[in-house]
Swiss-Prot record:
EC number(s) on file: 2.5.1.7
A GO molecular-function descriptor: UDP-N-acetylglucosamine 1-carboxyvinyltransferase activity
Reaction equation(s) it catalyzes: phosphoenolpyruvate + UDP-N-acetyl-alpha-D-glucosamine = UDP-N-acetyl-3-O-(1-carboxyvinyl)-alpha-D-glucosamine + phosphate
Modified residues (2-(S-cysteinyl)pyruvic acid O-phosphothioketal): 126
Protein name as it appears in the record: UDP-N-acetylglucosamine 1-carboxyvinyltransferase
Residues annotated for UDP-N-acetyl-alpha-D-glucosamine binding in this entry: 102, 316, 338
Location relative to the cell: Cytoplasm
Major site of localization recorded for this protein: cytoplasm
Pathway, per record: Cell wall biogenesis; peptidoglycan biosynthesis
Record-stated family: Belongs to the EPSP synthase family. MurA subfamily.
Binding-site list for phosphoenolpyruvate: 25-26
InterPro entries named among the record's database cross-references: Enolpyruvate_Tfrase_dom, Enolpyruvate_Tfrase_sf, MurA_subfamily, RNA3'P_cycl/enolpyr_Trfase_a/b, UDP_GlcNAc_COvinyl_MurA
NCBIfam families membership: murA, PRK09369.1
Length: 428
């Protein structure tokens, strides 16, 4: 994507309006990868039109798959995609594709299962610390694959079908759980995955595979049991809505003292985010077609957050909460326990007048009376969203460069915010 900037005029209008929640990127990408396992065409509804989805489409096409995209131009969300992988003819994915998206590593298990071998360049995506593939590789080896890392490539092969086994992860990993699950669904015998990730997006992948004919029990628990089947056939499936996107728009409303109606999600789907939004001074109310989030208290309250695997507080939301906490009455603390080096946004918020200090895995944020517009640079996807929230509540104009990272996770965000009264302009 061409380098772009956002020009944000803050402190003009509170965010107020209706936004339709999109399908979850963190569900869409592994489900697209799982389509590599299936016979026949798959129809996926609720698909977000994001840069990462485009890259995954290019990846599947490079292997011989066919993809057609039917866009929902009215809502600019929840599109339909048809994927057919009947005629795969390639098992190697070049660095030009994988360097753009970390989720490319999720294709290791499916390609290996389908083709008997896989070669995937080490993935890219946001630079938010060390996210090694060790657990992915270990799980595939447990299933009988031969795996070696040669330079920048992971090479996998198997002499026959993978064989079911017991995979006991030493720590919780969403990606490794998903890779192991996809590799196990057509393995010979039974596989048990212990200490599995239980994020809603992992459960969505499992439910999709069950629709395709997989035999999986324990969905939504720390122990998954998979009985391998001979083949899987393409179902229709609707991707769950994006709780990270919904939480981001909710914080934009709280930061600006506004109100946003988010269609398609519930407070239950937000999980602990709903509790933390209310703790900051917001009010979260379920309505027939979604929920309404508004600023309930006259001031923003400080928070203490500890990121953790689901059902704990998601690491993907801490930057946005940090931006909102910059204007809180008091001192907030955010403790990052999932990824290292995920406070790269702190220096940029400080340019806007934030009183934020990072020591180790903890950011301390003392609320200030106001933020001021500045020229800042977005270091990664969620930091982009955080800087946009800060810009909306700052006085003056904020210019956010490198904002193309934003569109890895948020579709037409500036258009949706403009419809809610924000003054936001995309500059290419």
């Amino acid at each position: 994507m061409v380098e772009a900037s956002l020009r944000v005029s803050g402190s003009t209008n509170p965010i107020s309006g209706r936004i339709v929640a999109n399908g979850a990127k963190n569900s869409a990408l592994p489900i697209m990868a799982a389509c590599l396992l299936l016979n026949g065409s798959v129809v996926l509804a609720g698909m977000p039109d994001l840069r990462d989805v485009t890259v995954m489409s290019e990846l599947i096409t490079s292997l011989g798959g066919r993809i057609s995209f039917l866009r929902n131009t009215k809502e600019k969300a929840n599109h339909k995609v048809e994927i057919n992988c009947d005629n795969l003819h390639n098992w190697a994915i070049p660095h030009e594709i994988t360097s753009q998206m970390r989720a490319s590593c999720l294709t290791l298990g499916p390609i290996l299962t389908r083709m008997g071998r896989a070669e995937v360049a080490l993935p890219g995506g946001c630079s938010i610390g060390s996210r090694p593939l060790d657990m992915h590789i270990w799980a595939l080896q447990k299933l009988g694959a031969k795996v070696e890392v040669c330079g920048n490539y992971v090479k996998c092969s198997s002499s026959g079908k993978l064989v079911g086994c017991h995979i006991d992860f030493q720590s919780v990993s969403v990606g490794a759980t998903e890779n192991a699950l996809m590799a196990a669904v057509m393995a010979h015998g039974t596989t048990t995955i212990s200490n599995a990730a239980i994020e809603p997006e992992v459960a969505d992948l499992a439910h999709f595979l069950v629709k395709a004919g997989a035999q999986i029990s324990g969905i939504g628990t720390r122990t998954l049991q998979i009985c391998g089947v001979q083949q899987l056939s393409g179902p229709s499936h609707t991707i769950i809505r994006d709780r990270m996107e919904a939480g981001t728009y909710a914080l934009a409303a709280i930061s600006t003292g506004g109100s946003v109606h988010i269609a398609g999600v519930t407070s239950e789907m937000l999980g602990c985010l709903a509790h933390e939004l209310e703790g900051m001074g917001g009010k979260v109310t379920d309505v027939p077609d979604g929920l309404v989030v508004l600023r309930h208290s006259p001031q923003i309250n400080p928070v203490v957050l500890h990121t953790a695997p689901y059902p704990g507080f998601p690491s993907d939301m801490q930057a946005q909460f940090a931006a909102t906490a910059c204007l809180a009455r008091g001192t907030s603390q955010i403790h990052e326990h999932v990824f290292d080096r995920r406070f790269s946004y702190a220096r940029e918020l400080a340019k806007m007048g934030a009183d934020i200090h990072v020591q180790g895995n903890t950011a301390s944020i003392r609320g200030v009376d106001k933020l001021h517009g500045a020229s800042v640079q977005a270091p990664d996807l969620r930091a982009s969203a955080a800087l946009l929230i800060a810009g909306l509540s700052a006085q003056g104009v904020t210019t956010i460069s490198n904002v193309q990272t934003l569109y890895r996770g948020y579709e037409a965000m500036e258009e949706k915010l403009r419809a809610c009264g924000a003054e936001v302009e995309l500059v290419r």
